[in-house]
């Protein structure tokens, strides 16, 4: 018999509710899309569904990730005390929790139109496959970018009934962004990952990691600039991009010596990048 009161702290850790930055990194692209699709005036229903869905799916994704990595996590110093790796949560408990979260997410998406439901099925498959890719390719961060950005076509489908070209332009920018911050994150564990056979862009880029991150950061901002021009956004949007540029330069400063605590700080700093881009979008539609 599961003692919920005793296990709840472990469940919350398994779902990473003790590390909310991951929720926001998933939420910002969702909010970008919800606001742009609705031209700055999203319906309360759609906004709530997508915000709640982001929180739930991030939690579910963390469970799948830890399930896939439970044997590898024991050999990486930073992850060896994760609930599944340490045994504080059983595989059965994790799967039951995942099933509950999936049911909640499915219930939410059923409140939307058919196209959004169909896209949601693809989104679930993207999330399920991602954790296993790091064994076979050095580009799991690219797949993560697609999975984390899949809420964008869903938001447009829910709002306007189809996925226009501008949605895919936003999607492209959003896909590149997680490659940036998850490469910074992977730099923390690079030595341990090499030992246990985990692949990542941090390992692929090697000593060119900062250069590649910089090129990706520039591509993100350039794509957003093109998006702003296409949508005729005003100066508020570009001020948001300017702040994002400053934050990205700060991240380059942080990772210059590739020290794990500084790489983690750079990763966390991306929350503010997403926030200021969203703030620029929000203020553009209000002025």
UniProtKB/Swiss-Prot annotation:
List the Gene3D superfamilies hit by this protein, alphabetically: UbiA prenyltransferase
UniProt xrefs under InterPro entries: HB_polyprenyltransferase-like, Prenyltransferase, UbiA_prenyltransferase, UbiA_prenylTrfase_CS, UbiA_sf
Where is this protein primarily located?
membrane
Q: Which cofactor does it need?
A: Mg(2+)
| This protein's pathway | Cofactor biosynthesis; ubiquinone biosynthesis
EC number(s) reported in the record: 2.5.1.39
The record lists the catalysed reaction(s) as: all-trans-octaprenyl diphosphate + 4-hydroxybenzoate = 4-hydroxy-3-(all-trans-octaprenyl)benzoate + diphosphate
Which top-level enzyme class is recorded in the Swiss-Prot or TrEMBL entry? transferase
Write out the GO biological process terms.
Answer: ubiquinone biosynthetic process
**Which residue ranges does UniProt annotate as crossing the membrane?**
21-41, 44-64, 91-111, 112-132, 139-159, 160-180, 211-231, 235-255, 263-283
Q: How does it sit in the membrane?
A: Multi-pass membrane protein
A GO molecular function assigned to this protein is: 4-hydroxybenzoate polyprenyltransferase activity
Cite the entry's keywords alphabetically: Cell inner membrane, Cell membrane, Magnesium, Membrane, Transferase, Transmembrane, Transmembrane helix, Ubiquinone biosynthesis
Localization in the cell: Cell inner membrane
GO cellular component terms, A-Z: plasma membrane
Role according to the record: Catalyzes the prenylation of para-hydroxybenzoate (PHB) with an all-trans polyprenyl group. Mediates the second step in the final reaction sequence of ubiquinone-8 (UQ-8) biosynthesis, which is the condensation of the polyisoprenoid side chain with PHB, generating the first membrane-bound Q intermediate 3-octaprenyl-4-hydroxybenzoate.
Q: Which PANTHER family match?
A: 4-HYDROXYBENZOATE POLYPRENYLTRANSFERASE, MITOCHONDRIAL (PTHR11048:SF28), PRENYLTRANSFERASES (PTHR11048)
* Family, per entry: Belongs to the UbiA prenyltransferase family.
**NCBIfam families reported for this sequence:** ubiA_proteo (TIGR01474)
Q: What is the official name of this protein in its record?
A: 4-hydroxybenzoate octaprenyltransferase
């Amino acid at each position: 018999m599961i003692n919920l009161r005793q296990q709840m702290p472990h469940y919350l850790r398994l779902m990473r509710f003790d590390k909310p930055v991951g929720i926001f990194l998933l939420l910002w692209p969702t909010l970008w899309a919800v606001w742009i699709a609705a031209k700055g005036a999203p319906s309360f229903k759609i906004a709530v569904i997508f915000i709640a869905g982001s929180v739930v799916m991030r939690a579910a994704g963390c469970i799948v990730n830890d399930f896939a990595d439970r044997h590898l996590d024991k050999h990486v110093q930073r992850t060896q005390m994760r609930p599944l790796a340490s045994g504080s949560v059983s595989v059965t408990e994790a799967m039951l929790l995942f099933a509950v979260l999936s049911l909640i997410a499915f219930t939410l998406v059923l409140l939307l139109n058919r196209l959004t439901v169909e896209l949601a099925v693809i989104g679930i498959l993207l999330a399920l496959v991602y954790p296993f890719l790091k064994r076979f390719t050095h580009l799991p961060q690219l797949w993560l970018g697609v999975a984390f950005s899949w809420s964008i076509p869903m938001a447009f489908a829910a709002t306007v009934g189809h996925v226009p070209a501008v949605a895919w332009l936003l999607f492209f920018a959003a896909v590149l962004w997680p490659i940036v911050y998850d490469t910074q994150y992977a730099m923390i564990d690079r030595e341990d990952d090499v030992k246990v056979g985990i692949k990542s862009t941090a390992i692929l880029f090697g000593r060119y990691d900062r250069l590649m991150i910089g090129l990706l950061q520039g591509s993100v901002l350039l794509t957003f600039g093109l998006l702003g021009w296409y949508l005729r956004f005003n100066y508020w949007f570009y001020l948001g991009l300017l702040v994002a540029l400053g934050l990205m330069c700060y991240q380059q400063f942080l990772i210059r010596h590739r020290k794990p605590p500084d790489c983690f700080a750079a990763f966390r700093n991306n929350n503010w990048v997403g926030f200021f881009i969203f703030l620029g979008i929000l203020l553009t539609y209000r002025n």
